[in-house]
């Protein structure tokens, strides 16, 4: 008898004004690390099943082995060769090679499995083009970043009419191409410059319940662009062909007093779970009347790929749908299903045939689980 699939597709009642999506249910995990993390920013699977994890608050850059439970730090913070100023996300490149942008020192570290083997200096063409801020990398020799206009001095507010360029830079030659334009997240910014014109102070406060368009580069070179109006996913192939997704059948939720109270309650719970030791400065406080006309369909910055290469987008919680859930959109721009998780769980990264989930306990400590995910779980994109 065939083994039970690690992912089972069920049906659920249709959302109001939308088609009936399939629920993709994860089976129990097959591995869990007992080491607690404080703030996980990336998980990168190696071919032997170990993972590289970045935890900039505590453990920094580590390699973890599910079989032995061993978690070992790689290098250390510092300015020397192979050291880093900040444990930024690790990106897979060819084979078991990876890169980590050390943007505080305007350089890039290259890894072979669990060893840092080279440091790319600030005069490299890739560093100059991206200023050290590398958002994604692929296995065919490119990195991706954003290129925005210089912010004006004083206080300004970006709107959904403002955009930024998604740029691709070839690691070998430094050639830069603009792949797409994406709308930025509406944000109030305050900039102060010194006599030389350099930024001496900067603050930013995203407007409440507003999101910008998002993009992701898959290791195979495909670019996913998550559009906001209408909510859809456009795909760009490595050779430049675009597949424009149709509007996703997700209901538009109008802002109401019920939604406002639900949002304020979510914010209060988050602040209680993550108390700040310093008061919030006035320019970063959200005005009481700062509400959009409609709820955004997704949360900013909580996207990832599935093992098949579909894009997974975390749904914006609402009064009627407060739980943690992810839309799964295939490479034709179709809604393939939805994954529902517990309130203390987040889907974090894909592996070759696995999905990695981060669970948070009552002390705000984070633990990594691995769930099997066969490639037959979803239709191909």
Outline where the language-model segments fall.
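Positively charged n-region of N-terminal signal peptides that target proteins for export
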Residues: 1-4
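Eukaryotic scaffold repeat domains enriched in small/polar residues
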Residues: 17-381
């Amino acid at each position: 008898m065939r083994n039970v699939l690690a992912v089972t597709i069920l049906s659920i009642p249709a959302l109001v004004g939308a088609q009936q999506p399939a629920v993709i249910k994860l089976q129990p995990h097959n591995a869990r690390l007992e080491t607690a993390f404080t703030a996980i920013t990336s998980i990168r699977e190696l071919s032997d099943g170990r993972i590289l994890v970045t935890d900039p608050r505590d453990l920094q850059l580590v390699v973890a082995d599910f079989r032995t439970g061993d978690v070992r730090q790689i290098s250390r913070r510092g300015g020397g060769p192979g050291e880093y100023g900040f444990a930024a996300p690790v990106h897979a490149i060819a084979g078991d090679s990876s890169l980590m942008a050390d943007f505080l020192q305007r350089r890039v570290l290259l890894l072979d499995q669990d060893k840092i083997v080279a440091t790319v200096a600030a005069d490299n063409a890739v560093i100059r083009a991206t200023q050290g801020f590398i958002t994604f990398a692929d296995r065919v020799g490119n990195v991706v970043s954003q290129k925005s206009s210089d912010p004006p001095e004083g206080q300004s507010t970006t709107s959904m009419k403002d955009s930024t360029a998604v740029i691709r830079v070839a690691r070998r030659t430094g050639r830069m191409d603009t792949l797409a334009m994406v709308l930025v997240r509406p944000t109030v910014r305050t900039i102060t410059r010194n006599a030389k014109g350099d930024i001496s102070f900067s603050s930013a406060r995203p407007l409440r319940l507003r999101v910008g368009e998002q993009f992701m580069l898959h290791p195979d070179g495909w670019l996913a662009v998550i559009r906001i109006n209408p909510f859809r996913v456009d795909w760009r192939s490595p050779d430049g062909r675009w597949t424009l997704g149709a509007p996703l059948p997700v209901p538009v939720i109008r802002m109401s007093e019920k939604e406002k109270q639900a949002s304020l309650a979510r914010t209060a719970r988050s602040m209680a779970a993550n108390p700040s030791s310093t008061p919030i400065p006035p320019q970063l406080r959200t005005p009481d009347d700062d509400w959009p006309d409609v709820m955004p369909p997704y949360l900013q910055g909580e996207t990832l790929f599935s093992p098949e290469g579909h894009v997974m987008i975390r749904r914006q919680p609402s009064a009627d749908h407060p739980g943690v859930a992810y839309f799964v959109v295939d490479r034709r721009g179709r809604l393939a299903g939805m994954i529902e998780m517990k309130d203390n769980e987040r889907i974090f990264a894909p592996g070759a045939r696995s999905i990695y989930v981060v669970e948070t306990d009552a002390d705000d400590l984070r633990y990594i689980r691995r769930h099997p995910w066969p490639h037959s779980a979803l239709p191909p994109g």
